[in-house]
Amino acid sequence: MDAFVAGYGTGGTLAGVGRAVKQRYPLAMVIAMEPAEAALLCGEMPCCHSIEGVTGGFIPPLLRSAPLDDEVKVRSADALAMTRRLHRDFGLLVGTSSGANVFAALAVASKLGPDPTVVTILCDRAERYFSTRLFGAGTLPSQG
């Protein structure tokens, strides 16, 4: 494993999985995914973004002890587009935080050279978002 990439809400998943990754794969990187519009770990101010369940406007205490090596920013629009791609092309009915994680993992993989192993987590499901813009006009398979 070369890297683990995930967003954070409470910080529990990123901190806990990050510690386990470092124990098993000491050279692997643990990378936090943050909305580009609210990249708190990068020193930016909290702001509105559309990646539900991620970055609640503060850096949670659990994350302060996480073995983080880097951060990657994902724009809300890129998270939404990746989420829709996961629905359409792979049949994975996930929410935007999962789309953001996949987008970030692919970005990290592209920087690591040939054939990296980058792991992420699909941490939500789409049923929570049926009434949001995630399922707006033009997103259903029958509509193109």
Segments from the language model and where they lie:
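Short glycine/serine/threonine-rich phosphate/pyrophosphate-binding segments
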Residues: 7-18, 97-105, 129
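Predominant activation on well-ordered alpha-helical scaffold segments within soluble catalytic domains
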Residues: 15-18, 51, 80, 84, ...
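Surface-exposed amphipathic alpha-helices with a cationic face
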Residues: 18-25, 109
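Short beta-strand segments
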Residues: 7-9, 32-34, 119-123
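Short glycine-rich phosphate-binding loop at a beta-alpha junction
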Residues: 4-6, 92-93
